[in-house]
Amino acid sequence: MALLRLVATECRNVLQRGYSTASVPTTKMFIDGKFVESKTNDWIDLHDPATNEVVTRVPKCTQDEMQTAVESSKKAYKTWRQSSILSRQQVMLKLQHIIRNNMSELAKNITKEQGKTLIDAEGDVLRGLQVVEHCCSITSLQMGETVPNIAKDMDTYSYHLPLGVTAGIAPFNFPAMIPLWMFPVAITCGNTSIIKPSERVPGATMLLMEMLNEAGCPPGVVNVIHGAHDAVNFVCDNPDIRAVSFVGSDQAGKYIYERAGRNGKRVQCNMGAKNHGVIMADANKENTLNQLAGAAFGAAGQRCMALSTAVFVGEARNWIPDLVERARKLKVNAGHLPGTDLGPVISPQSKQRINELVESGAKEGAKIVLDGRNIKVEGFEKGNFVGPTIISDVTPNMKCYTEEIFGPVLVCLSVDTIDEAIELINNNPYGNGTAIFTTNGATARKFVNDIDVGQVGVNVPIPVPLPMFSFTGSRGSFLGDCHFYGKQGIKFYTQTKTVTQLWREGDVSHTKAAVAMPTMK
C-alpha cells in the first residue's frame, strides 16, 4: 500500500509524502487533494519532545494560501452538497477501514511529534476512528421529521442540510482524535472542511489526508492549512467559513468564540478542565488506586479529561501513601520504547510551567509527597520529562488547584463527607468531567444527581462517551450550543429547512379517461 512508503527511516518515523526532501523536512499544506509546499518565509520548528531535536518545519501559511484553501472548499461544496448521502457514507466506510489498517503508522508519527507512548497513541487514533465509524450511520443520523395532514391537505416536513464551508482548529494533545472529531462529521453531513492542526503536531493530520484521498474523497472537500495566531484570525474572520470547531485552552477558546461569533459564525469550543475524582472509603481500594494513577499520569497528564484532582472522603485519605507507591513505579521514558508508562510533555515551556505550579503548592503550604520535577531519563537528557508528582494537603485557594496544570501532577484534597466533596466540585468553575469511586449505589446516585459537571463516571475515571453520545463538558469547560460528535455534532454541522406544502384533494387529476360525449356544461 502506498501509505506504508510515507514513513521515513525508523529512527525518525517522519512522514515523507507530506514533507519536502530538505535536510530538515517541511510540512506541506493539503489543498484541493494535493500536498502543496508553502511559499511563506515564516516557519515554526517542531521538536521531538523526547530529544528536542527538530523534526520538521511547519509553515505559517500566507493569507493568499489560506484564501486558496477557502476557494477550493467553496468550489467543492457546490458538488459535494449535492452528492448522495450513500456516496458520502461510502467514503466514511472506506476511510475507517484504511485508518484501522494503518494505526501503527499513525501512532509512530504521533509519538515522534507529541511524545506520548505508542500504546497511548494508538488509543488516540482508535477514539477518533470510532467517530468515523459512527459517521457511517449518517443515513439514519441525518434524517429529518415529517408530520402529514398537519392541516387539511397540508403536510410539513424538515430537512437537515449542510452549512457550507466549515473549519476546525485542533490542539496538540490528541493529534489524530480531535481532527477526527471534526472533519468526518462535517463532510459526512455534506459540508466541506478546513482543518488547522496544531503547529506542534501536524503529521497525523497529513497522514489522514493521504488516507482520505485513498478513500475516494473528492478534491477540496477537506483542505489543511498551518499556522498560529494569524491562521486562527483568518478562520474567525473569513466570511465564507460558516462554522468553527475548536479544542484547546481557555484563553484561545474564549478568544475564538468571541471573534468568530462576532462575525456571525456558529462556534463550539471545548476548553480547560479540572477533573475531580472522589474516593469513598468503601471503594475497591486496589482497583481505585490503579485507576487513579492511570487517569492522572497517562499521556503525561496532557488530556483534557485527565483526572488531575483527587478528593479523598473520610478515612480514604489514608490511601495516599499507597497511591504514591503505585505512581512511583510508573516508568518515564521516550514514548517509542517498550515498557514506557508516560513520555515527555510537549515543550520546555510546558515543563517549566508545570514545575512552577508544583512549587507554588509547596510555597502555599501543601506537601509534595512525590516529586517528579528533577527526573533524569538516560539517553534523553534534553527531553521535556516530568515524572509522576503528587501534592497532598491542597486547599481550594491554592494556585495548584485553581489552575489547570496539564502535566503528570495529581493534587489531593481531603473532606469529611460526600456533601463537602460535591460542594467543592460544584464551586470549581470547570465542568468537563468527574468521577466517583464507591461500592455504595445510593452514594453514587446522589453524586450523579447533585454534581454540576457535564460528564460523570461511576468507577470510571475518564468518562469520555462513545460517539453515539456527545462529548458534553459544561460550564467553564465549554462555549457553544451544540457539543462535539453524536447527535449534537450532527446538529452543529447542519441547518434545518422546514417545508409546508398544500395540495388540495379537489385538484387531483382524473385517473381514468372520460369517454362520454362532451356536453360543454
Curated annotation (Swiss-Prot):
The protein's Enzyme Commission number: 1.2.1.27
GO biological process terms, semicolon-separated: thymine catabolic process; valine catabolic process
The UniProt record lists the keyword Repeat: no
CDD domains, per the entry: ALDH_F6_MMSDH (cd07085)
GO molecular function: malonate-semialdehyde dehydrogenase (acetylating) activity; methylmalonate-semialdehyde dehydrogenase (acylating, NAD) activity
Pfam family, one: Aldedh
Keyword line: Mitochondrion, NAD, Oxidoreductase, Transit peptide
Binding-site residues for NAD(+), renumbered to this chain: 170, 172, 196, 199-200, 249, 404
Disulfide bonds listed in the record: none
SUPFAM superfamilies hit by this protein: ALDH-like
DNA damage found in the keyword field: no
Catalysed conversion reaction: 2-methyl-3-oxopropanoate + NAD(+) + CoA + H2O = propanoyl-CoA + hydrogencarbonate + NADH + H(+); 3-oxopropanoate + NAD(+) + CoA + H2O = hydrogencarbonate + acetyl-CoA + NADH + H(+)
Subcellular location: Mitochondrion
Gene Ontology terms: cellular component: mitochondrion
PROSITE patterns named among the record's database cross-references: ALDEHYDE_DEHYDR_CYS (PS00070)
Cross-referenced InterPro entries: Ald_DH/histidinol_DH, Ald_DH_C, Ald_DH_CS_CYS, Ald_DH_N, Aldehyde_DH_dom, MeMal-semiAld_DH
Active-site residue list: 304 (nucleophile)
Superkingdom, taxonomy of origin: Eukaryota
Coarse class of the protein's main subcellular location: mitochondrion
Protein function: Probable malonate and methylmalonate semialdehyde dehydrogenase involved in the catabolism of valine, thymine, and compounds catabolized by way of beta-alanine, including uracil and cytidine.
Family per record: Belongs to the aldehyde dehydrogenase family.
Subunit comment: Homotetramer.
This protein's name: Probable methylmalonate-semialdehyde/malonate-semialdehyde dehydrogenase [acylating], mitochondrial
